[in-house]
Design a protein with these regions (language model features):
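Catalytic cores of the polymerase beta-like nucleotidyltransferase superfamily
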Residues: 1-501
Length: 501
């Protein structure tokens, strides 16, 4: 082993020691294993990342006495072992919560050995770069760097390639196919021909994987800063169509003579554009960038954020186009109403993937509303009432819609002879946001001009849903700045009542 690798192994050893010292949960696990003379191995991703000089918060241990160890640690520390994988018997050690205490910095999982030894276990893992183990029991005795690497994972990390541990690695668990592309992107690896061959041979088995596991891996991919490049690789190798069959009709669907990209490639380009804007969000939104980032970071389900669902919406925003394509008398191609059909298709896809109701509604609404900023952009100057109605959607929708619009615009510009001039886009979005913050947002604090009692008395109504309908209409007019006084509000209510009756 060369000097560079020895230096890296020294760093790995230091990382392991810092890990043990920096976590009460882990130090207790190590001490309990030592006292009971149980074997204990640190495995997988933490070691891979430590070798590369990266941090990792997910820590995995294995032991032939995993169940006994978990119980002993729980007794000593008050941690709660929670079963998270029934198939492999993996438990997560949840530390007790103490007031004013600093939280556990790591997520700690403990699993039984697969097979009769640590080497059997490592051979059953997915990829060689993950088939690493650090012998904690041996380290306790001499504090040495007891790294086990039976499949050459360190060499593969050095060479930047992703190899499977065995011929059956992917067929045993086809979800590892998606993980392969995610690892390639995250660590800048290459897929050797043999690995790609294994992927193509096993990808038909993806339909045997539980939908929830597919969903989790897909959302992990979308949460990556380079999700577009991962999806392109999956697409080129024919894997993505197995995961998102609803998108097959978007392929090879030409949009117009001026737009060279067909619908599916345009959607992937829009996702790339979104990732560009997320990386350069201040350039697009200026002083408003922090507010947008706060909204996008909100969690919709578990650890899945609004931003991750926005990426899915960008990928699906034109999913309705194959069903609304028409050709005018002059030969122009139209997709009238594709956002309505697309919203329904996007909702069905989200339901199939078992996304939460919040995620499903969010993605569906973004697809349904994605043409609104486009229509506003085409009007010069932008009508204030139309702009007010757009912002009436609320920050949880208008921020993602602005980013979806910007991404759609950038992808369109780059696919035409117009080029990639984004200055008009930046200026219009800044103007819209100035209008919102200077004129609309202050109105959010204004109380209603009239009450339901006022309407009942003035219009001689009895309490009914009509009163609520009138109040909602007046609130929208007040938001738009169309009514400012009590007299104006009551007169408008009378006109609306006459109109509706």
């Amino acid at each position: 082993m060369n000097r560079l690798v020895n230096i890296q192994l020294s760093k790995v050893k230091s990382s392991v020691e810092n890990l043990i010292e920096g976590s009460k949960n882990i130090s207790a696990l190590v001490e309990v294993a030592q006292k009971a003379q149980y074997d204990l191995y640190l495995v997988g991703g933490f070691l891979r990342d430590a070798f590369l000089g990266k941090s990792c918060k997910d820590v995995d241990f294995v032991s032939s006495k995993a169940s006994e160890l978990a119980k002993l640690v729980a007794i000593q520390t008050g941690s709660k072992p929670v079963l998270i994988d029934r198939k492999f018997g993996t438990v997560r050690l949840i530390p007790p919560v103490h007031p004013n205490a600093i939280g556990e910095p790591y997520v700690v999982d403990l699993s039984p050995l697969r097979g009769s030894s640590i080497f059997d276990d490592l051979y059953q893992r997915d990829f060689t770069i993950n088939s690493l183990a650090f012998d904690i029991s041996a380290w306790w005795i001499d504090r040495g760097a007891h790294l086990l690497d039976p499949l050459g994972g360190i060499t593969d990390l050095e060479d930047g390639r992703l190899r499977v541990c065995s011929r059956g690695s992917l067929s045993d668990d086809p979800l590892r196919i998606l993980r392969a592309y995610r690892l390639v992107s995250a660590y800048g690896l290459i897929l050797p021909a043999q690995t790609r061959k294994h992927i193509l041979q096993a990808c038909h088995r993806l339909n045997q994987v539980a939908v929830e596991r597919i969903r989790d891996e897909m959302m992990l991919i979308l949460s990556s800063a380079s999700s577009a490049s991962i999806l392109r690789m999956l697409d080129e190798d024919g894997v993505l169509k197995l995961l998102l069959p609803e998108c097959v009709d978007m392929r090879n669907l030409q949009q117009s003579d001026s737009l060279h990209l067909e619908v599916w490639q345009h959607s992937l380009s829009a996702l790339e554009a979104l990732e560009f804007f997320l990386t350069n969000i201040r350039e697009l939104l200026g002083d408003y960038a922090d507010e947008a980032s706060t909204i996008l970071s909100q969690k919709l389900a578990g650890e899945r954020s609004r931003q991750t669902s926005l990426k899915l919406a960008v990928l699906l925003h034109d999913i309705g186009k194959p069903f609304r394509r028409s050709v005018g008398k002059n030969g122009a191609i139209h997709f009238y109403g594709h956002e309505v059909v697309g919203s329904e298709l996007a909702a069905s896809l989200c339901i199939r993937l078992r996304l939460s109701n919040k995620e499903t509604n969010f993605v569906s609404q973004l697809v349904r509303q994605h043409m609104r900023p486009i229509h506003l952009f085409r009007l010069t100057p932008t009508p204030t009432r139309a702009l007010s109605r757009f912002f009436r959607l609320g920050p949880e929708f208008f921020w993602p819609l602005l980013l979806l619009f910007a991404s759609d615009y950038k992808a369109f510009q780059e696919a035409t002879s117009v080029g990639g001039d984004l200055k008009p886009l930046h200026q219009r979005i800044r103007d819209w946001l100035d209008f919102y913050y200077e004129q609309l947002k202050p109105r959010e604090m204004e109380p209603p001009i009239v009450s339901g009692h006022d309407l009942i008395k003035f219009l001689h109504l009895s309490p009914s849903p009509m009163v609520g309908r009138l109040l909602n209409a007046l609130a929208e007019l007040q938001w738009e700045g169309c009514i400012r006084t009590r007299r104006e509000a009551l007169d408008q209510a009378a006109r609306l009542l006459k109109q509706w009756n």
